């Protein structure tokens, strides 16, 4: 099974090289595009990619030099850094780093079954490595919906509707 997963990962990673990004840069850019506003610090990127802080620091620096991301400093704590995609970064992700049928050409039924099975495998790996799951906000035990309003009870903040489908560092699966 491992060789299949490795081969699929290489096929997906090879597409990033055609756009001038190495696989780590493409993975970091894709993560930042999918992460919520609370999960875009360098340490969050490193934890998600299971990479060293040094590797991620150089990766983020390269993405910033390419004009794909911009550094944001916290108003509350000037030492705290997060990254947002620039317009060029969003355009690149939209065009090349997607789950579109051309990127992943399988039927919906096969994709759903593969997703379910791969999710189970991923959960086992993450548990074995004692790594964070980084799930979607809407699947978190702290995600609350009241009418059209969304709220994170853990961070005590209101959420935009679009944040429900973003990856969160703090996510804890609902029971």
Description of each model-found segment:
Residues 1-19:
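N-terminal leader segment of winged-helix/HTH proteins
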Residues 25-29:
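Short alpha-helical "packing" element that flanks the helix-turn-helix/winged-helix DNA-binding module
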Residues 30-37, 97:
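Short, locally clustered residues in the helix-turn-helix/winged-helix DNA-binding domain
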Residues 38-80:
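Canonical helix-turn-helix DNA-binding module
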Residues 62-112:
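Charged, amphipathic alpha-helical coiled-coil/dimerization segments
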Residues 95-136, 141:
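Terminal interaction helix/tail motif
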Residues 134, 139-175:
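Long, low-complexity, charge-rich intrinsically disordered regions
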